[in-house]
């Protein structure tokens, strides 16, 4: 067993581990210290899994990569861990695109869709800060990431080789320093100092590193650095003098001049071979296309050291062989680090599926002369490659998948007791015959107490019909399924959270953030129809939606008990027994979680002021019947920004599903909304100044 050694992480919290958190923390810590490569934390909904993870991180004394399956959850985890570890390097690494339309070609329509994107400067800064912290040699680094961590990056040794070290009294020529900044892709701008830019005023050079919020002033005296100062590039306020400073590249893909020359030769050779292939096959259009595009890129690389889409040449830049795995964020970690995969039952399948989708899209681009074959090596990791790069793994889920359980070899740590003392909701089975009347009666019992209900149906048509039936019965209800657009979907979820409706009917309610303490009833119609959304893991997940209420209850409507139902019923009863015994032994009285509307909105990631939400509703409801142009006049600036954000999410889903035309259409709508919002901002600013 390894000793604990000096603590590198400082966990700050007003809470102490409760329930069975202490045992879970110790078991996971011991497993990491003993060198176990795979562990599973099976933590029920509401048991405080994030706090347990934070305590384990505080004990293991090694860098940590925490992977979440979507940006929203990653942002929540990042915020929580920043609070837990204010003195350590908690970093954030997700896709830096506000919107991203990948390059694609549709042969059946002879339609090429150019790559279109908008980079979020703040997220790009946070990504660079993450890689900078990892390469700095610090051990107290926690990186919270989406699956972006498995996508290609520049080689860490190339990136590290480009770092500029500055020290007071160091000999360095001013002009050579300027050339170094340009080689790191900093841009000179003497009028607008911003991240990734520098300005020159005689012997004083000011710059804003991409990974820092403060600017750096470098004062020269002859060929010597006389002074280094940190300052606010907006106000000019001087913060402090520094003895030394490190300047990191302003882009993820960088290479020295020698490597660039080698890469260009490799690209030339590949182009020549590809032209022979096309011409011998009498594909002259494709040959002309690939030659024009590649020659243009080569000219840009020669002149600027960079080109749009340079990542597609990453194999040449890093000197890799065809088919060799790309460098990614995991390469920036030291050999000894810990990976925690949150919601592993969802995250692992997502990681597994990234490679195939990327490959199919790029193969078409290569076949039709839009890209060289080496572009195929700018890709996410294959799942088996990901596995080989993870030295130690903790998978976290309320319903771990077969993969995690098999890899752990039975090393499963359970966290079944909630700090609130709440038991898992009781599950009852009732017959299908008369299920609607029984459901109506049950819903009325729960709504009479001020609680909410979730109802899962088998089909979209059933959800709509049941919604109509409940509404005619005088209940406040809405339905939700895949045909409802993102804007309306968000509106419906807000109505549930703000108490404007009491019942939500849907086919798949697992994808929504519906962990609301007011939900006391979960009803699953036709629970015995084994298959998607009626398997054991889905049933367990949806049953957990009622786990935050002391009167939580789950009803399976079925004529027989399937193997999946039996597993969920037996497992729930086992957990209830453990929870009940703990409460009795420790004198804990179960209590529902109580949250205000504002708290609920905030914790579920839809924190809009209620009045803004009400003002925006008209626009949300009318979007399907009116064009964007008609809406902009009736909406306020902040509402236009909010609508653009919702459409951006819908656009990203379309792009990931390879619905490129839909994504392009939504991109145009986003642009219209943002342009309209900017016009309103400028006009409002003009009115204020007048």
Curated annotation (Swiss-Prot):
Gene3D superfamilies (alphabetical): P-loop containing nucleotide triphosphate hydrolases (3.40.50.300), UVR domain (4.10.860.10)
Residues at which ATP binds: 43-50
Entry function: The UvrABC repair system catalyzes the recognition and processing of DNA lesions. A damage recognition complex composed of 2 UvrA and 2 UvrB subunits scans DNA for abnormalities. Upon binding of the UvrA(2)B(2) complex to a putative damaged site, the DNA wraps around one UvrB monomer. DNA wrap is dependent on ATP binding by UvrB and probably causes local melting of the DNA helix, facilitating insertion of UvrB beta-hairpin between the DNA strands. Then UvrB probes one DNA strand for the presence of a lesion.
Motif (Beta-hairpin): 96-119
GO MF annotations in UniProt: ATP binding; ATP hydrolysis activity; DNA binding; excinuclease ABC activity; helicase activity
Residue intervals passing through the bilayer: none
Provenance organism: Chlorobium phaeobacteroides (strain BS1)
Chain ranges of the UVR domain: 641-676
Domain of life per record: Bacteria
Pfam families: Helicase_C (PF00271), ResIII (PF04851), UVR (PF02151), UvrB (PF12344), UvrB_inter (PF17757)
Subunit structure, interactors included: Forms a heterotetramer with UvrA during the search for lesions. Interacts with UvrC in an incision complex.
Compartments in which it is found: Cytoplasm
Major localization class: cytoplasm
InterPro entries referenced in this protein's UniProt entry, alphabetically: Helicase/UvrB_N, Helicase_ATP-bd, Helicase_C-like, P-loop_NTPase, UVR_dom, UVR_dom_sf, UvrB, UvrB_inter
Gene encoding the protein: uvrB
Location of the Helicase ATP-binding domain: 30-188
GO biological process annotation, one example: SOS response
Protein name per Swiss-Prot or TrEMBL: UvrABC system protein B
Domain Helicase C-terminal: 435-601
Domain notes for this protein: The beta-hairpin motif is involved in DNA binding.
Alphabetical keyword list: ATP-binding, Cytoplasm, DNA damage, DNA excision, DNA repair, Excision nuclease, Helicase, Hydrolase, Nucleotide-binding, SOS response
